[in-house]
């Protein structure tokens, strides 16, 4: 059966645009038929533990002699790997927090990026599998603007999911999400609303076709 792994990381449980867009994707996916199943992991409501030992970055065979990371954390890493390997599509809600991904999402990436297991040349069981990244950004980071290049969220996800894991990364983006809140951004309200609607439409289209 076609299976979706749906991850959210926004701390905003009421008005998050990344959550709204990932929900639109997941709802459209389910609407394709009963066989289209979903596993939802909320990284904010149920945060993962940071690595307790640096050797957790490595598979057991590559760890230093005497290394003994907590067994329960190795078991959690194995569970997270099983979740992503079971998915035909991975959906990642990734709001931009202080110019990068939320720390809760970064921990998930750390658990996934284990050289020789899911990541690295010759060990990419997820190669070619679609990953849909929903990026919501409070401001704008247009080419040629003073803030060009300040978004360090999407590049991280492209490198880890795309380059290291070999996944086929699709990015759905909505900007100016703070225009309704900050008076100094009022001129961007119309743009923010239009980008949000476009992101919803793009997510639904991907959910129908992937």
Curated annotation (Swiss-Prot):
The keyword tRNA-binding does not apply. It holds the Pfam family Flavodoxin_2. InterPro entries: Flavodoxin_fold (IPR003680), Flavoprotein-like_sf (IPR029039), FMN-dep_NADH:Q_OxRdtase_AzoR1 (IPR050104), NADH:quinone_OxRdtase_FMN_depd (IPR023048). It is an enzyme of class 1 (oxidoreductase). Binds 1 FMN per subunit. Its cofactor is FMN. Belongs to the azoreductase type 1 family. HAMAP family: Azoreductase_type1 (MF_01216). This is FMN-dependent NADH:quinone oxidoreductase. It comes from Kineococcus radiotolerans (strain ATCC BAA-149 / DSM 14245 / SRS30216).
């Amino acid at each position: 059966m076609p299976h979706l792994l749906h991850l959210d990381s926004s701390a905003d449980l009421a008005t998050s645009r990344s959550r709204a867009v990932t929900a639109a994707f997941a709802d459209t996916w389910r609407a394709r038929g009963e066989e289209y199943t979903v596993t939802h992991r909320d990284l904010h409501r149920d945060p993962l533990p940071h690595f307790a030992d640096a050797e957790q970055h490595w598979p057991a065979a590559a760890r230093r002699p005497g290394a003994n990371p907590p067994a329960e954390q190795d078991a959690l890493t194995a569970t997270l790997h099983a979740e992503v390997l079971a998915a035909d599509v991975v959906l990642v809600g990734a709001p931009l927090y202080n110019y990068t991904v939320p720390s809760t999402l970064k921990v998930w990436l750390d658990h996934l990026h284990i050289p020789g297991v899911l990541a690295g040349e010759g060990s990419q069981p997820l190669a070619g599998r679609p990953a849909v990244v929903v990026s919501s950004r409070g401001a704008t980071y247009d080419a040629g603007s003073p803030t060009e290049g300040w978004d360090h969220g999407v590049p991280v996800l492209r490198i880890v999911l795309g380059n290291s894991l070999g996944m086929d990364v699709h990015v759905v983006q909505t900007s100016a999400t703070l225009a309704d809140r900050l008076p100094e951004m009022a001129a961007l309200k119309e743009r923010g609303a239009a980008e949000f609607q476009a992101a919803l439409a793009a997510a639904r289209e991907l959910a129908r076709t992937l």
